[in-house]
Amino acid sequence: MNQRKGTTIVPFSFFNMSTDQNLNKIASLLDDLLSEEPAYFCVNMRIKPTNNIKVFLDGDEGLPIAKCVQFNRKLYKLIEESGLYPDGDFSLEVSSPGVDEPLKLIRQYKKNIGRALHITFADDSVKEGVLEAVAEADIVLAHTTGKGKKAVTEQLVIPFNNIKSATVQIKF
């Protein structure tokens, strides 16, 4: 996994060199677009063998659909102008990762402070709790055991390298 100015690039393992090069070029074009609007950032990007480019963006205050459309149009134009796909044989999808996708970047954790998380650890054990704080190397999770008067809440400091996945839990 490459990290570039807040952009996470996760290429498929069977990519050929030109696909990797295209992915890096598109990431560079996207970085330039995102530098104009620093409240938004790239979470993930991939290119399918059919030249279907999928870009997953997020924002510190969320990502409105209108912004997805705006980024899609601008990035599509930049890709066309770059000549990466001279025959125009590509498609582009720009969207948010979705609520069921695991958090990947520290910025995502920070924007979800105060929300319930479901964390799977490297050993496949699980904890749920409220995200209270985020630092460079770890998070603080308020984990409650028991119910009612017997409920006990403890603050767990969890290093990022112990987290296999963390997803936001939507409570209704």
What does each of the following model-derived ranges do?
Residues 20-24, 62-69:
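Ordered, soluble secondary-structure elements with a strong preference for glycine-centered loop motifs
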Residues 101-122:
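Short boundary/loop segments of OB/S1/cold-shock single-stranded nucleic-acid-binding domains
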Residues 80, 117, 121-128, 132-172:
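Conserved RNA-binding domains used in RNP assembly and mRNA/RNA metabolism
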Residues 31-41, 83-87:
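Short secondary-structure junctions
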Residues 39-45, 128:
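A short linear hydrophobic-aromatic micro-motif
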Residues 43-62, 85-100:
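Short, charge-patterned binding micro-sites
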Residues 66-69, 73-106:
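Helix-adjacent hinge/juxtasegments
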Residues 1-27:
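N-terminal presequence-like segments and adjacent domain-start helices
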